[in-house]
Amino acid sequence: ELVKPLPDNSEYYVSIESLGSQPKEDYELLELHIEKSLDKNIIEDAVMAKTEKELQQIWKIREDVAILASKAKFDQHFDISIPISLIGKIINSIILELESISEVKTIFPFGHIADGNIHFIIGRDIDDPVIIDKINSIVYSPLKKHKGSLSAEHGIGLHKKEYLQTSRSKEEIKLMEQIKIM
C-alpha cells in the first residue's frame, strides 16, 4: 500500500537518505539541517522516517514512480543528465514547452539531484509519430547547449540514436561506433 508522507500539493519533492557511522548523531544532525532549512524557507515541509517501515514506505513511492506517473494511454520515458546547477531551470523550461502540446496529458520529472540524472515520464493520449518527435526534440534540445547527456543510465538504443548528436560530437559518435564494432 502506498502511504503519502506529505501532502501532494508541492511542485517538487526530494528524498534524502543518509548513512553514517553514528546513526543517532547522524539522525540528529540531519534533523538540525532540516529545521534550519525550514526556518530559512529553503524547504516548505519535511518528514523523516523514524522506523524501517516508514523508510520503506518512502522508498516505495520512488520505486513505483512509473506506475504513479502515467495516467495516459501512451507514454515516453527519458533518462537525461544535465548540469546540477541548472536542474530547476532546465526542467521548468522543458515542462513549459511540453504543456503547449495538447496531446500531452502528464509530465512527470524525477531523478537524482546529486548527479544531474533526470528522468521524465510524459503521457500522451495518442500514438502519433509527429507528436513523439516533437516531445523528443523538446526534451533533448537543452542538452547540447548545456553539455548534458542523452542517456544518463540506460544506454542509447535505437530510439535515441537519431538524437545522439544533441549531446555528442561527430568524433565522439564515430568513436562510439568503432568501439561497438570491436
Residue ranges and their predicted role:
Residues 1-182:
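Noncatalytic alpha-helical scaffold of FAD-dependent oxidoreductases
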